[in-house]
């Protein structure tokens, strides 16, 4: 029977000082001996996805204490990728994931907490907390802040749906008037919550559901909807149950490594491919798997990308559907239900509800259940009122979207594409692979060959695109922007956005050892591994070299002879693998990150071998 970790600080005469300090936080005599559960919040006023979380930690804490635990809340940092985008601030986004994971470990281990409820939402916060959860392997439940409502505005007598990416594209399009650009900007992000499309934040919150670490609706129920309050309440209640199951009944099935097994990671990846999620999720799943010592790597992702069809198309791949529409169609459970019927789900994997996926689908899949309560839950919809308040409205759709032939979620037979929404490409320019979000690629450019236009920073690429240096048919190459070379592996949303603004969204490709925002679409290929700073072949590309991309056959190649490649490599080895003329100030904190960063195919985690010996 495992001993409560917290007993280290609450029992024994030699812990009198620790108990005195616990008492100063409000712990009473009768509380000693109860499990201490960390409420890991991420409230900040910098981020719309987190601005409404201030009081939600205490909502969870009250439920924990009512159920027989001691709740202690702390906050992590949270970077808003959208605000950090397009300038030096983006260098800090991915490294913040490691800081979040470490800070959770520091707080939980320093105070000997027994379990956690992780209140996350946006891009690097959910992954950082997930990494910490797999590392610590104590009972945990994730509950996110929820997605933002889609924006809406009237243009040319037509109501259109909007999101953050629309504001960015219109703002850079010289053909759009100042008045229309401002109208879209003011309408794009109407409420608190994570940006309304299937961008990185919402993708990751959906994946925690598929991993079994969060409750039904976590990934899709709007931040503003009153129903979301129950997710926080039940998380507080359920974590006490999980904690007691492990520590008092020796039930190891309550631990995250026994829930998020390899089968669960494959379920999460299947979901990601089926819904055309952000390419960033590949980085984060690989990183979390390594923390949990789960044997899951790029080979598994490549294999699954060839099996799983594209069942759910959401912004930025279409403007017809946003997260509120996914929820109306049954949410994550709805997509997993279709994967299960297609034989593509490990349905004996378990979840924090204590159910197998087979059992959970029977209860929560709108295509299977007779429960009016469940159907009402999935009819929760937007109010269209600007607000920063959680649980501020109770609007519902009149009907569910259960049209699996032409609706938001499709059956395998009616899939948007039999080819999944993400793909791994390999070739001489990316020996360890690179990632493309095929859900956002127009069919006309699934095969593409063009001359390289090479840039050694995102800033130069933006200047070149807006300055007319990129023409239809070109392959834009942005290198030395990987985890080590950036450092920090910036998102390339501005270059891809400006290609669209210049009318080149379906006429060009972009290849980088950096990464992309979940808001990216188009023929945008990222995570080229090894990265240029680690001697990757993307560092050998010269202006005008032909690059051939073949998504159906999963290949990408630099059309240069092996002899020429070898000569270029010898030359680059002598010069050193670094940008020729880039001027970029890099702080000590970022240099420390770069000194241990691995390439994207390893999840851009720190190279632990550098700590050995």
Curated annotation (Swiss-Prot):
GO terms for biological process: isoleucine biosynthetic process; L-valine biosynthetic process. It catalyses: (2R)-2,3-dihydroxy-3-methylbutanoate = 3-methyl-2-oxobutanoate + H2O; (2R,3R)-2,3-dihydroxy-3-methylpentanoate = (S)-3-methyl-2-oxopentanoate + H2O. Its EC number is 4.2.1.9. [2Fe-2S] cluster binds at residues 122, 195. It comes from the Bacteria. Mg(2+) binds at residues 81, 123-124, 491. Pathway: Amino-acid biosynthesis; L-isoleucine biosynthesis; L-isoleucine from 2-oxobutanoate: step 3/4; Amino-acid biosynthesis; L-valine biosynthesis; L-valine from pyruvate: step 3/4. One of its GO terms (molecular function) is magnesium ion binding. GO terms for cellular component: cytosol. Gene3D superfamilies: IlvD/EDD C-terminal domain-like. Pfam families: ILV_EDD_C, ILVD_EDD_N. Binds 1 [2Fe-2S] cluster per subunit. This cluster acts as a Lewis acid cofactor. The modification N6-carboxylysine is found at residue 124. Keywords: 2Fe-2S, Amino-acid biosynthesis, Branched-chain amino acid biosynthesis, Iron, Iron-sulfur, Lyase, Magnesium, Metal-binding. Its cofactor is [2Fe-2S] cluster; Mg(2+). The active site is at 517 (proton acceptor). Functions in the biosynthesis of branched-chain amino acids. Catalyzes the dehydration of (2R,3R)-2,3-dihydroxy-3-methylpentanoate (2,3-dihydroxy-3-methylvalerate) into 2-oxo-3-methylpentanoate (2-oxo-3-methylvalerate) and of (2R)-2,3-dihydroxy-3-methylbutanoate (2,3-dihydroxyisovalerate) into 2-oxo-3-methylbutanoate (2-oxoisovalerate), the penultimate precursor to L-isoleucine and L-valine, respectively. Homodimer. Belongs to the IlvD/Edd family. PANTHER family: D-XYLONATE DEHYDRATASE (PTHR43661), D-XYLONATE DEHYDRATASE YAGF-RELATED (PTHR43661:SF3). This is Dihydroxy-acid dehydratase. It comes from Vibrio vulnificus (strain YJ016). The lineage of its organism: Bacteria, Pseudomonadati, Pseudomonadota, Gammaproteobacteria, Vibrionales. The gene is ilvD.
């Amino acid at each position: 029977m495992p001993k409560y970790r917290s007993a280290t600080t609450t029992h024994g005469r030699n812990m009198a000082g620790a108990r005195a300090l616990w008492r100063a936080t409000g712990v009473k005599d009768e509380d000693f001996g109860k499990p201490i559960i960390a409420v890991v919040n991420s409230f900040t006023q910098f981020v719309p996805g987190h601005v409404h979380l201030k009081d939600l930690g205490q909502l969870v804490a009250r439920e924990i204490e009512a159920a027989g635990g001691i709740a202690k809340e702390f906050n992590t940092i949270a970077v808003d990728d959208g605000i950090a985008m397009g300038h030096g601030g983006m260098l800090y986004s991915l490294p913040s994931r490691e800081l979040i994971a470490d800070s959770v470990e520091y707080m939980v281990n320093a105070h000997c907490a027994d379990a956690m409820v992780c209140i996350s939402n946006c891009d690097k916060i959910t992954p950082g907390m997930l990494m910490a959860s797999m590392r610590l392997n104590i009972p945990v439940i994730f509950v996110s802040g929820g997605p933002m409502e889609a924006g809406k505005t009237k243009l040319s007598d037509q109501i259109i749906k909007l999101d953050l990416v629309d504001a960015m594209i219109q703002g850079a399009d010289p053909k759009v008037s100042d008045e229309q650009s401002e109208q879209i900007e003011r309408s794009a992000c109407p409420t608190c919550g994570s940006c309304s499309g299937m961008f990185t934040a919402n993708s990751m919150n959906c994946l925690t559901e598929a991993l079994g670490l969060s409750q039904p609706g976590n990934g899709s129920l709007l931040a503003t909807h009153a129903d979301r309050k129950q997710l926080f309440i039940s998380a507080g209640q359920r974590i006490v149950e999980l904690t007691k199951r492990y520590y008092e009944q020796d039930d190891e099935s309550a631990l995250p490594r026994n829930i998020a097994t390899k089968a669960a990671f494959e379920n999460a990846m299947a979901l990601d491919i089926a819904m055309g999620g952000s390419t960033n999720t590949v980085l984060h799943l690989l990183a979390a798997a390594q923390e949990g010592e789960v044997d899951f790597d790029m080979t598994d992702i490549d294999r699954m990308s060839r099996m799983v069809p594209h069942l759910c198309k959401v912004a930025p791949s279409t403007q017809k559907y946003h997260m509120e529409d996914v929820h109306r169609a049954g949410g994550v459970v709805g997509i997993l239900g279709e994967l299960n019927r297609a034989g593509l789900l490990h349905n004996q994997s378990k979840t924090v509800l204590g159910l197998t996926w087979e059992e959970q689908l029977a209860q929560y899949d709108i295509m299977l259940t007779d429960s009016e309560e469940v159907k009402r839950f999935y009819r929760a919809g937007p109010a269209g009122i600007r607000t920063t308040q959680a649980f501020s409205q109770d609007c519902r759709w009149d009907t569910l979207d259960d049209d699996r032939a032409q609706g938001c979620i499709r059956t395998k037979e009616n899939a948007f594409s039999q080819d999944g929404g993400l793909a791994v490409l390999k070739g001489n320019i990316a020996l360890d692979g690179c990632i493309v979000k095929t859900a956002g690629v127009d069919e006309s450019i699934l095969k593409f060959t063009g001359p390289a236009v090479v840039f050694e920073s995102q800033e130069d690429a933006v200047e070149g695109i807006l300055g007319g240096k990129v023409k239809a048919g070109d392959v834009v190459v942005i290198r030395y922007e990987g985890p080590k070379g950036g450092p920090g592996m910036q998102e390339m949303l501005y270059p891809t956005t400006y290609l669209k603004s210049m009318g080149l969204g379906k006429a060009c490709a972009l290849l980088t050892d950096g990464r992309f925002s979940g808001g990216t679409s188009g023929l945008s290929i990222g995570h080229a591994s090894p990265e240029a700073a680690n001697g990757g072949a993307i560092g050998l590309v010269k202006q005008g070299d032909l690059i051939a991309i073949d998504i159906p056959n999963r290949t990408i190649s630099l059309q240069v002879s092996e002899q020429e490649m070898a000569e270029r490599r010898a030359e680059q080895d002598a010069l050193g693998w670094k940008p020729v003329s880039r001027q970029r100030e890099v702080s000590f904190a970022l240099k420390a990150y770069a000194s241990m960063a691995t390439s994207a195919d390893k999840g851009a985690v720190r190279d632990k071998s550098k700590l050995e010996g």
